Amino acid sequence: MEIQQTHRKINRPLVSLALVGALVSITPQQSHAAFFTTVIIPAIVGGIATGTAVGTVSGLLSWGLKQAEEANKTPDKPDKVWRIQAGKGFNEFPNKEYDLYRSLLSSKIDGGWDWGNAARHYWVKGGQQNKLEVDMKDAVGTYTLSGLRNFTGGDLDVNMQKATLRLGQFNGNSFTSYKDSADRTTRVDFNAKNISIDNFVEINNRVGSGAGRKASSTVLTLQASEGITSDKNAEISLYDGATLNLASSSVKLMGNVWMGRLQYVGAYLAPSYSTINTSKVTGEVNFNHLTVGDKNAAQAGIIANKKTNIGTLDLWQSAGLNIIAPPEGGYKDKPNNTPSQSGAKNDKNESAKNDKQESSQNNSNTQVINPPNSAQKTEVQPTQVIDGPFAGGKDTVVNINRINTNADGTIRVGGFKASLTTNAAHLHIGKGGVNLSNQASGRSLIVENLTGNITVDGPLRVNNQVGGYALAGSSANFEFKAGTDTKNGTATFNNDISLGRFVNLKVDAHTANFKGIDTGNGGFNTLDFSGVTDKVNINKLITASTNVAVKNFNINELIVKTNGISVGEYTHFSEDIGSQSRINTVRLETGTRSLFSGGVKFKGGEKLVIDEFYYSPWNYFDARNIKNVEITNKLAFGPQGSPWGTSKLMFNNLTLGQNAVMDYSQFSNLTIQGDFINNQGTINYLVRGGKVATLSVGNAAAMMFNNDIDSATGFYKPLIKINSAQDLIKNTEHVLLKAKIIGYGNVSTGTNGISNVNLEEQFKERLALYNNNNRMDTCVVRNTDDIKACGMAIGDQSMVNNPDNYKYLIGKAWKNIGISKTANGSKISVYYLGNSTPTENGGNTTNLPTNTTSNARSANNALAQNAPFAQPSATPNLVAINQHDFGTIESVFELANRSKDIDTLYANSGAQGRDLLQTLLIDSHDAGYARKMIDATSANEITKQLNTATTTLNNIASLEHKTSGLQTLSLSNAMILNSRLVNLSRRHTNHIDSFAKRLQALKDQKFASLESAAEVLYQFAPKYEKPTNVWANAIGGTSLNNGSNASLYGTSAGVDAYLNGQVEAIVGGFGSYGYSSFNNRANSLNSGANNTNFGVYSRIFANQHEFDFEAQGALGSDQSSLNFKSALLQDLNQSYHYLAYSAATRASYGYDFAFFRNALVLKPSVGVSYNHLGSTNFKSNSTNQVALKNGSSSQHLFNASANVEARYYYGDTSYFYMNAGVLQEFAHVGSNNAASLNTFKVNAARNPLNTHARVMMGGELKLAKEVFLNLGVVYLHNLISNIGHFASNLGMRYSF
């Protein structure tokens, strides 16, 4: 039987397979049956193939148990066993190469045509129920097996332990099976010294088209004492039901290994499972490229050895790979007296009987063995041991340089999820990192190590971009789980992580370590570390409207960006942060104004420690839900604040740690709703406009100080410093701090209390006023330099210029009686009358001790916790309803004792805002829910959010918004079509210079005999003056609309020609595609649309008169979503889809004025046009009562226009033009159905008659003989709504 020897590479549609994480073994032949151990099989199967969840070792599909049992069962008993023994001639020539099929196999393998599958296939002689054993254990040399395609069984066992096997030298091999009532498994076993795979190998593929019988299961075993390798072009494909066993000292597969290939076209929904077993490889296993899945939810498993290396791992969007590492000590071999071993011996003995009873021997060393006529005996199977999941040994490693997911455009609710699972001690992802291919509806990747650690050295990419963003209306989700079962795994990320918009990261582990995370590239990310049970360590975290779920963390640096996000879009630490959380440095970046502010807020926690805190204008820090926040080093304003910039810092209880410094000014806007403890820190007050800002404490304040003296100045270390105090407004009390209760304590003496006059006086000595760096409330004078400093502080030039006149002050402390201080149980303040002047006998002095540092003390670190002066918060009173009916939003405000907020609501948001709030909180929920929402939100914030929502809803109802993508595409095409008409209107240019150049080129030329000189003139005439053209352009556009972001990009192509018959005319047609996106200022409305535009255009010439005609149509498919982040508006979040369409016709007349030998043409023109715009009705996918609905809309517009165009032609083909004009709408009719939310309706306002001004320009240059480059830009401005539209194009033209 001949088999094909032609070269062939596989190129078939493939399927995905769903796996088993079960170790699958076989019993190939008696000589090495014990090599593939089976004692561990049932335990592994029981531990990892129970349950139904995909993606975890302990929860694989139940099929795993089925396939493992089938592959591990006693091989199917053959009807006949054919045996071939290689003669001694094969033992003599180690350098000789043989064709294994022709030399030994062909006599016992039949072949034929499979009509059902329309392909040829091969089988063991006599049928798939027979077996072929080839004994060539002493053979040497190299044996090739090439072109054994569609081998459908039965079992094939080749023992060539001393020889080299080359699979697929000229053609590939395919080993498969047929599904029949016996459900047989095809087992193919090659045992060689070395095995190299040079072409494709298929395991359990369907024969031919796959339309006939399907495959059952196939086990291919490759054993090599030295090594198994594959060429880079040799692809190994495992189909549904395939198992590949590899046993060697090392395995190195350079070609792609594809697990889960499609067996036939259309098998995308069919279940599919495959397994690779490398547990008997003693060295490293290397996969250069491993692919799992082919357009379906394939699951695959690798029963691994200690070290598995994968270069690139490609996962289909819903595929899963499970890599099972061996336990500590490895897999244990089965004892020799196990039932299965006995069974094997019995089989051998029974075969021996057959040899004696019904054997026939011939000179070809071939023996036919028939089974006995007696009935087959019942076999007793081994006892199955059910075990739980196990951890990989401590030295087990899985290395993957790069993980990549592949996806298509299929949309499914919840998106698709790919997974990688292992139990190795270490899962290491290299410098290649992880790439997640994102499509509409979202894509996710789960990387899980059930019992070990995960390390990622490379970046995280979305659609092959670091910082890449998810498509509109979708999300991209990375998920890493370390030590899921042991609760003791560590996840480490050694590269900076940059996440674009709507890209999320989830990490579950005992400990998680990150180099850096940046979510400030657009915001709306989730960092979910709530599954980390011990500590999350982040070197640098950059956020902007990011949801951070984390507890007990160490963040070296936290940078909070505003990034153009609207008010209310904060970075939200959405989990209780616990009691062990610390941030070394917090930096709030400067916003631009209130509409572009941001910040950070916390859901709750026991304690947060911050070393350094730098805040900036228009950024917010809300830690009111954290019980205690401590600043240990610095709380300071970052970049110098501008007069309009306000920062807001909000705390529950705040502690300023020992030696910490806090800057405070009018820009700080610090709120402390609970207690404030200054534990030997310093508060720096900045004077602005002659005033200081008052630090207000909601409950109690404690001022803890010590007796330490600064030896350089002689002063006690101050707790409060007022800088530039000389600028304070005189005769005015300046309150520095006020609280319900203020207590004072001296930690050096261990005394503290409330209303303790002695402690209050001690504190006043630590309240210092400075003029520059010189203290002005008290002067400690030790020498003449101190006299000068005192003079500069109080503004006394005499002391500065003549310090000797004031030597009587040396050795004394002088008190400036122009400054009085108050420190009592409710406030701390200063009163500035103006500076007094020291006199020799004026008093107000105190003698200094001989050694000014003798009274210094070492302050202890006692904190004033549970201060005796703390008081509980008052409980607010409830006010009965007496003005409004129950069930209205007004009644809820009144019940909350916020009646004034009703007026604020109507004043700032109007009746429409009130109705929307009624719909969201009461009509869709109840009064209790409404009370909960308004209690959590101020009146100003409610009106801001309502105004944002109504603006967004008005956008949704607007037909102008729905067709904006089509209008931008039409504007782009108008620019391109005008350029084409300018190009083909070169009617007046006489090409004098060009023609002269051509005549000059003919000088001294000699030609063969021609019928006429016309042929010469034609050859050198300008051929490209009026050509037929094919053109294509890349287009882009954007709308400048009050902060909204609307853009379009796409392509346009067409064909046109100049007709020079009885009528001179230009005719052409075009088609274009553009993808448009829209994000409003609040980023609450996101849209993406696919738009098409097509039409025809023409120009007719009559002397210098030009008549233009144009007709076009457009269609757009829009997918939009509402994405409000605030709890108040969360019910509005939903997505919807609609179609937008337009049709337009235009006619215009113009007259050409030619100048400069017809190179310059000026053309005034007038025209009229008609536009029909419309959109279909839609209903959102929301299940809430506020599901958005909108009816269809339609509008007819009639316009008139006037334009002036200048064209300049130079050379033979190049030109430049500029066109400016005005378009006026003079009539419009149509309908606009209201958008509705439950009982709330949004009626789109009818637009006024618009006036547009338009300027466009462009030109073209010749690149090659018949190829031209053109460029154009256009700007359209709506003079009524003040909205601008900009578009540009870059394209090529080919003339023929």
Curated annotation (Swiss-Prot):
Residues 345-358 have a biased composition (Basic and acidic residues). This is Vacuolating cytotoxin autotransporter. SUPFAM superfamilies: Autotransporter. Induces vacuolation of eukaryotic cells. Causes ulceration and gastric lesions. It comes from Helicobacter pylori. Pfam families: VacA. The signal peptide, cleaved at the inner membrane, guides the autotransporter protein to the periplasmic space. Then, insertion of the C-terminal translocator domain in the outer membrane forms a hydrophilic pore for the translocation of the passenger domain to the bacterial cell surface, with subsequent cleavage. Transmembrane segments: none annotated. Residues 1-33 form the signal peptide.
